[in-house]
Amino acid sequence: MPALPLVIDSDTGSDDAVALLLAAAGGLGDVRAVTTVAGNVPLATATRNALISLETAGRTDIPVHPGCARPMVRSLSSAQHVHGEDGMGDIGLPDPVRAPEPSHAVDVLLGLPRDRPGELTLVTLAPLTNIAAALTRDPLLFTRYRHVYCMAGAADMRGNVAPTAEFNVWADPEAARIVTRAATPDKVTWVGWDVSRKDAVMAPEDQRRLERLGTPMATFAHRVNRTVADWARDVTGLAGYDLPDPVAMAVALKPELITEREQAHVDIAVGDQTRGQMIIDRRVTAPAPNLTLVRRVDEVGFKGLLFDTVARRIPTSVSLGARRGSGAAPWPGAPAAPAPGSRR
């Protein structure tokens, strides 16, 4: 079976990094481009982390394109309290060996599917700012992709950043609303935090298994989630940290992992109290569905894919713990990377 041609939009923090390993090193994905956006961390940091993650996967051939540095109408609210100041657990990762591409993410998101209509699958792991910006220029954008998978929302209205909202939608609800209003269920599938919370939790025994593998990718995946594990223990009440972006990526790579789904009409709340909440209309009189919502996945199958991928031994230029990022700009014109434990 040929690898799935992919374009990935990411605000690369710790779980995005693991999702990039699945796509770039697992053999099921053919990653044509990674676009970055501000979300978990500021844009320059997300771009740096995407470059490092791809290096860890041995894929310095995959281009990385920076995109929007802030939400459409709001100021940036990052998740550095979850992922660390550097977005990768503050473990002192080395600077990337290459620079990102000069072309803007939105131009790439528009241009690639025009050149290859119906061929590419888009996977979004971030606030939907880049995608919404692209839609304002091409309202038919989703018809040009084979399919679009978004790690977005919480279909049970149980949130992680707010009582009823998931971070990616909460961070830029106006962008998420633009996406839902352009979507159709045959083209756009959302995998929400409710799925991750139920079927993608790395319990202590899973974390120990990851650590015992000892490969560069397994060690990377384990260590970059260090601060997420602390946050999960203190805030979510889960048995371990969960992996929302990797499970969304796994669904895109292996849709047969889906065990429960529904089609529904979804809108997004943009008011202060309910900011980012999914409004799902399941009434008989509801408007026509605009999204497919994944509700459950095969947990054993997902974790099998994860462990099989990171168990691979591949050449990589990333040496964990061998040297720390210098704090200098990681590529010409980029801001300096934050030192581990520093505060902006």
Tell what function each PLM region has:
Residues 77-84, 162-166, 205-208, 285:
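Short, surface-exposed amphipathic charged segments that create phosphate/polyanion-binding patches used
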Residues 41-45, 72-73, 154-158, 266-283:
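Short, mixed-charge aromatic SLiMs
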Residues 1-3, 19-23, 30, 170-174, ...:
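Conformational coupling and interaction surfaces
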Residues 2-4, 45-115, 289-311, 319-325, ...:
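Metal-dependent C-N hydrolase catalytic cores
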Residues 64, 179, 249:
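A residue-level signal for conserved active-site and pocket-lining positions in enzyme catalytic cores
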Residues 2-10, 64-69, 88-90, 129-136, ...:
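Short, mixed-charge, low-aromatic patches
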Residues 2-52, 60, 86, 92-198:
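Active-site histidine-anchored catalytic micro-motif
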